[in-house]
Amino acid sequence: MSDEEHHFESSDAGASKTYPQQAGTIRKNGYIVIKNRPCKVVEVSTSKTGKHGHAKCHFVAIDIFTSKKLEDIVPSSHNCDVPHVNRTDYQLIDISEDGYVSLLTDNGSTKDDLKLPNDDTLLQQIKSGFDDGKDLVVSVMSAMGEEQINALKDIGPK
């Protein structure tokens, strides 16, 4: 054994948070990065090629974490950044007083670094279901280094 100790904290193995995709191939309900925010595309319109230049794509998208509306216009032949968006389901174990949740992962360990969602209706559903003693499964969306609870699944009483 050597005296050197290596500590690797990264969990994404150096993988890129986004990948390039040609603007003309991004469709409604797809994902795109606008102003460094991961967004879901709600509307795409394409303008014809003009006298000087390319056809342009006009994207209207909603930030997947803040629900803010963002817009961007990109030449259809150019590449856009598309975020790697992952959805994972976890069983809710506990809600702490400071607003953090304790979640059970598939391999049996716990995940304790997520806060309750900002969405009031979802927040109330989670709290009331948890207070009623139901087994709750929350859906966590992650993209570009951010994570947030975005859905709730009720799997019945305990």
From Swiss-Prot:
GO terms for molecular function: ribosome binding; RNA binding; translation elongation factor activity; translation initiation factor activity. Lys-51 undergoes hypusination, a unique post-translational modification that consists in the addition of a butylamino group from spermidine to lysine side chain, leading to the formation of the unusual amino acid hypusine. eIF-5As are the only known proteins to undergo this modification, which is essential for their function. Keywords: Hypusine, Initiation factor, Phosphoprotein, Protein biosynthesis. Residues 1-10 have a biased composition (Basic and acidic residues). The modification Phosphoserine is found at S2. Pfam families: eIF-5a, IF5A-like_N. Residues 1-21 are annotated as: Disordered. Induction: Up-regulated at post-transcriptional level by iron deficiency. Translation factor that promotes translation elongation and termination, particularly upon ribosome stalling at specific amino acid sequence contexts. Binds between the exit (E) and peptidyl (P) site of the ribosome and promotes rescue of stalled ribosome: specifically required for efficient translation of polyproline-containing peptides as well as other motifs that stall the ribosome. Acts as a ribosome quality control (RQC) cofactor by joining the RQC complex to facilitate peptidyl transfer during CAT tailing step. Involved in xylogenesis. This is Eukaryotic translation initiation factor 5A-1. One of its GO terms (biological process) is xylem development. Expressed in leaf vasculature and inflorescence stems. Present in xylem tissue but not in phloem, and in developing vessel members, but not in mature vessels members. Detected in anthers. PROSITE patterns: IF5A_HYPUSINE (PS00302). Disruption phenotype: No visible phenotype, but presence of extra root protoxylem cell files. Belongs to the eIF-5A family. The modification Hypusine is found at K51. It comes from Arabidopsis thaliana (Mouse-ear cress). GO terms for cellular component: extracellular region.
